[in-house]
C-alpha cells in the first residue's frame, strides 16, 4: 500500500459551534429541531444555547470542564450540547435508564464538574452529584429564568480542544471514555456527509439511545449540515417508530440492522435514505430495503468520529460485508498477532486507522490508551509521523482493489448486541464480584455472547465451581454441572445484583457452573472450545439452564414414568414440534412454548387417542406429571355425533313443517326444494357478521388475491374446487329468512354444489354495499392464468379455517380425496344454550354491577360514513415469563383504555377461536368456529401488573366452557349484560397461519370491502409463528378521533405497557403511568 492510495484526509480546523453558527447566519429561520416537546429554528436554538452558555460560565464551565448531560430525548438535548461547547466545556451523555452506580462511576472517572439535566431527570442527577461537583442544573428552569445575555465571543475555544467524551464498555469493569476534539468531530462529519446523502434538506431521526455514540452524531449530522433534527416522544421512539417517522416527515435515518428488521419499508413513504450500522449487515437486510430507499452503511467505533468507512450504495456491492471505503481516515492492515508488522496486501489482518477524526485516547486511563492506540509505529512512513495517535480497532478486515474494506469479525472479546458495543471483560468483572459474595473467593468467570438453540444473540456467563473434580471426559459433556434445586433462585439473585452495575443488555441470561475452564496450549482460556462444547450439549441439558421461574422447574431427569405420561409426552412433542427428549414430565407447558391455540391442537390430538383433556386443564396443571392425574381415558376411537337434516331448526320454527321450510328456502335461493339439503340456525359468528349489515352497511367480505404458479392447470384447478365445494357444506350455505310461529327468523340453507369457479370477474363494488343478498351464494371464485381471486363473506370462514379450505383445494388438485365437512356438530354445540341455565348464570354474574360505560363512547348516529377509520401499525416483542401472550395484550389494552377514559372496568369484544369445543376433529375442520363475544376486564389498580395478568389468565380459562353463547342471548340475560354488549372496542389476537396455506397458494394478499368493523376501536395482533413477536394493527373511527384527544400516542402507550408487564411486572397498576411518563 503506497502513500498515494492511502492518503490522510485534510483536517478541518473548526469548532462544532462555529460550524453551527454559520448555519445560523445562512438560514436563521430554517427548522433546526422538530421535537415532540417543541420546535426550534436555527436562530432560536442559537439564542437559547447562548443563554445557557452564559449561565454555565458563571458556574465555572469553561477551559475544558466536564459536564454530564442527563436528558430524555427532547429539544433540550441540542440546546445543552451547543451551550457547553460555546462555554468552552466538554460534555458527555448519560443514559438515565442505566444503573445509577454505573452513571456515578462515569462522572467520577472524568471528574465531572456538574450534571446538566432535564426537569424529568432531576432526581437521577441529584443521586450522581457529590461534594466535588456543582449542584445539578435543570436546563428548562435555567433557560426560561435568565435574560438573553447578548452576543458572545465564540473564538475563545480552539478547534484542537476536546469537545466531548464518548463512553464505551470497558474490560476493566468500568466504562471508558474516548476524548474527541472539535476538529476531529467536524472533520468526520463534513468528510462523510456526501457519501451518506446528507445535506441541508435532510430531516434526520434522533433514534439512538444516549448510551450509543450515534446519538450525538445524529445531532451533528443535522445541526452542522443545516438539516433538521426530528425527535419523537420517548414512547413513540421505542414503540411506534413507523408513526414517528411519518408524523415528523423523516427522510433520513440511521438504524442498526436489528431495529430496521422490525419495520415495514412500504409504510415509510417519506424515507429517502437509510443508513445501517452498529452491527453486521446481511443480504436479507439488503433485499428488504433496497426496493424502497437509498441504502447506505456506516462502519466504525466511537473512537473514530462519524465512523471509519461509508458504504455509499449497497445496491452496487456484491457482499453485505463490504463496508465501503474510508472518507475521513487512512486505513492500515497489520498482522493479527503483531501490530508492529503490516499484513501482506490483500490479506486479512487487524484494521488500524490514522487521521484527524481519531480520538485523543481514553480520559484518565493511560494503560487502556496505550493498549488501544499506536504512536508512530515503525511501518508508518516518516513523513506521516506526528503527535497524533493511530487507533487499533480490534476488527479483522482486508482492503479490496477499489479501496473498500471487507469486514471479517473481531480478534478480541468485544462484541455487539443489538448494536450496543460491549466488552465481555466488563461483564466478567462484575459477575466475579457478585459471585464472590457467595463463595470464599471470586471464581474464574468467562462471559460469552452466543446464539443457543434459536435464541437471539445473548450473554452467557460460565463460572468455575470450587471443590469439584476437574477431570473432564473426552467429549467435554462432563464439563458443565447440571442445575440443582437452587439454580433458578441463584440466577435471579445474580441478575438482580448485576442490575445495580450493568445495563439490561449486558446482564447474562444464564450462569453456567463448570468443573473447570478449558485452556489453550499457552495457558489462556480456550473460549472457542467452551462455546463449542456447550452448543454440543443435548437439547434437554441446554434448556435446563434457561429456566425463568414460571411456576415449575424443568428437570433434566424427569422423563415420563407411566404409559399415560409417555403417551402425553408424544402428544406434547408433536403439538409443539419438539423432539421427545426435549419434553420432560416436569416441564411447564408454557416454558416449552405452549400457548392457547397450541393447547387446542393438543386437546384435539388427545381426543383422537381417547384422552379427555381440556384447555383449562393444560394451563392449570402445567406439567405432564400433574396433568395426567386429572385426565380420563376412554377405550375405542372417538365418534362424531350425527344430526338428521333440518333437526337443528325445527325447535326454532315451532309448528312449521320441514317441507314448508324447504319450499320457503328454495324460493329465496331460486332452487328446487330438493336442492335444499339442510337448514342451520346462526352461530355466534354468523349472528355478528350477517345481521348488522342491514343497518350499518358493513358487509364483512374478504377479498383474497392469489398469485398462482405459471405452470398450474386451470381446468384441473376448477375440477378440484368443485370437489372441495361438494365436500364442504359450509361453502354452500346461503342466508334465508323463514317464517316462525309469530315472526320471521334468519337461518342458513345448505344447497347442492352449484358454486363453480368463473372467469376473473370485474370488481365494481361500492363500500358498504351488501355484495350478497338473501338466497345468494356467499363465496365467489374467479380465475385467470396466474391469478385467483376469492370473495367470501365472513359467515363462511374464520382466520383458522380459510387456510384449511386452500389445503383441501391443493389436495383435490393433486388427486387426493377431500374429507367431508359437516357443520352440524358445531352448530348443535353452539345451540345447546337454550337449556343451559347454569351457563347463562355464568354470563349474568360476569357482567353483574357493570355501570354501562363503554370506551370509546358509542357513536349515537352510527352510519356508514362515521365508520371510516384511521389505521396505525406497531410491533411487539415477547419473552417467556409465565404469562400467556394473549393476557399480556388484553391487560395492556385495558390499562391504556383506563388511562383514556378514567375507568378500571373495561368491556370489549373479544374474538375467540373456540377450537377447544368438544367436537372431534374441530382443529382440522375448515368450519367457521370463532365468535365475537362481550368480555370484561376489571383492573385492580392497587395490585401489580403480575397480579392483574394472572387474574386475566384465570378468567380466560374459566370462560372457555361457556363460549358457546350467541351475542343475542347475552342481551337478554340482564340490563348489565345488555349494556356490556354495546362494547365499542374489538380485540383480536391471531396466530400466523401462513404455514397452513399450501405452497401453490402462499403468495397472496388479503383485504376487505368497505369498513372493516362497525366499532370505534379495533386492535388486531398478528403473532409470528414462534409467538416471539407480533405486528399490531389499530383502527379508530373518524368520529372517535375527532371527539377524543391523545390517540396519536395510544399505540405507543400500549406497547410500553406490554414491555412493562415483561420487564417490571411488580409495579402496581396505579403507579405505572407515572413510571412510564405516559
Curated annotation (Swiss-Prot):
Organism, as annotated: Aspergillus aculeatus (strain ATCC 16872 / CBS 172.66 / WB 5094)
Protein EC: 6.2.1.53
Gene designation per UniProt: aneB
Protein name, as recorded: Nonribosomal peptide synthetase aneB
Gene3D superfamilies per record: 3.30.300.30, ACP-like, Chloramphenicol acetyltransferase-like domain, N-terminal domain of ligase-like, Nonribosomal peptide synthetase, condensation domain
GO cellular component terms, semicolon-separated: cytoplasm
Domain commentary: NRP synthetases are composed of discrete domains (adenylation (A), thiolation (T) or peptidyl carrier protein (PCP) and condensation (C) domains) which when grouped together are referred to as a single module. Each module is responsible for the recognition (via the A domain) and incorporation of a single amino acid into the growing peptide product. AneB has a monomodular A-T-C architecture.
PANTHER family: FATTY ACID SYNTHASE, NONRIBOSOMAL PEPTIDE SYNTHETASE
Alphabetical list of PROSITE patterns matching this protein: AMP_BINDING, CARRIER, PHOSPHOPANTETHEINE
InterPro entries: AA_adenyl_dom, ACP-like_sf, AMP-bd_C_sf, AMP-binding_CS, AMP-dep_synth/lig_dom, ANL_N_sf, CAT-like_dom_sf, PKS_PP-bd
Residues covered by region (Condensation): 699-1013
